[in-house]
Design a protein with these regions (language model features):
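Internal gly/pro-rich beta-alpha loop/helix module
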Residues: 95-193
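ATP-dependent carboxylate-amine ligase catalytic core
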Residues: 1-81, 89-112, 125-129
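Short hydrophobic alpha-helical runs that function as membrane-insertion/retention elements
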Residues: 85-88, 142-144
Length: 193
């Protein structure tokens, strides 16, 4: 979405992964690198973030597993560098519970810079409205991504299909960006200095 808005975007991936970065690279139009406090260390992580900040207007760091899973976790990385967290929650089978889950993510660790949430796999515009309205007043809504075959990436036994195997990947990414643009109701978090 933000690339379509004309922003230069750099993306990093927490932990070891080779499938997600290929898809993220297509979405961002820039190389995607691993960012991990354990594997690369604090100094290397700081260096690559500093370099990316010099060439991009937005840096996105995709976590691995759940926000608090692993040691160090994506939450540890966010806290260490003061990076605002956007919680992406699979909302396909919930309504008001979405607000409770978002509240739990935001308040589980008091010092986590939590920016807000985005709902994934929503059933309709009305479903997105219900999810947004379930949020406590202090949590920001970043939009909803609908459940749609035009957006979802196919999977197989061991995970996602590789980027080069998807002839329509760019169309899927464009559809996802359009869906987020249609439901987003807030600006980006404040820049990290």
């Amino acid at each position: 979405h933000y690339r379509q808005c004309g922003l230069r975007v750099r993306v990093f991936k927490c932990g070891p992964d080779f499938l997600d970065p290929m898809i993220l690279e297509r979405a961002s139009g820039a190389p995607v690198y691993q960012l991990d406090l354990w594997m690369g260390g604090e100094a290397e992580s700081r260096r690559v973030l500093w370099e990316a900040a010099g060439e991009a207007e937005l840096i996105v760091i995709e976590g691995e597993m759940g926000l608090f899973d692993g040691a160090p976790s994506a939450a540890d990385l966010a806290r260490h560098f003061g990076v605002p967290v956007l919680g992406v929650i699979d909302a396909g089978a919930m309504a008001q519970t979405f607000g409770a889950l978002a509240f739990g993510l935001a308040h589980f660790q008091a010092d986590l810079p939590f920016a807000g949430v985005l709902a994934n796999r929503t059933g309709s515009l009305r479903h997105g409205d219900i999810l947004r309205d379930s949020l406590p007043a202090d949590l920001r809504w970043f939009g909803a991504l609908p459940r749609s075959s035009a957006v979802e990436l196919p999977r197989r036994h061991l995970g996602l299909i590789q980027a080069q195997e998807l002839a329509d990947l760019d169309a899927r990414l464009d559809a996802a960006a359009d869906a987020i643009a249609a439901s987003a109701s807030t600006d980006l978090p404040l820049p990290v200095s």
